[in-house]
A protein has these predicted regions:
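Beta/alpha (TIM)-barrel catalytic core signal, keyed to glycine-rich beta->alpha loops juxtaposed to Asp/Glu
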Residues: 1-121
């Protein structure tokens, strides 16, 4: 599934006066620097992590933390709230800083969309 489907769902919700809540901005760790728990190589979250390698490369090119980039990407969508799912104070500080940095430019959003391998491993 590419970025078009979630955006279509958000647009449909908006058209019907329904609020939208974003969840899993870092995709259970796939859009972070590293998975922080042991998982078997064939676990779905590990497959997602491998698919996001291009996203992490892009974050490195931009000299930013992948999780911060993921949060800024999520905040660029037309949503009412974003569930952060932080595990510690530093992650909360990082999320607040990402929000303070403001929305991503549309060109960067398109670059991120192209960076993620949605076809599999």
């Amino acid at each position: 599934m590419g970025p078009e489907k979630p955006r279509a769902v958000i647009a449909a919700a908006r058209a019907n006066g329904v609020g939208v809540m974003g969840i899993r901005a870092v995709q259970a760790g796939a859009l972070t620097s590293a998975i922080d728990r042991p998982l078997p190589d064939d676990h779905p979250e590990m497959r997602d992590y491998r698919r996001a390698e291009g996203f992490r490369r892009l974050a490195a090119e931009l000299q930013t933390n992948p999780a911060s980039l993921a949060h800024r990407y999520a905040l660029r969508l037309d949503i009412d709230t974003l569930v952060l799912g932080v595990k510690n104070r530093q992650e909360l500080v990082d999320c607040v800083a990402a929000a303070a940095a403001g929305p991503l430019p549309a060109e960067l959003v398109m670059q991120i969309d192209r960076s993620v391998n949605r076809d599999g491993d």
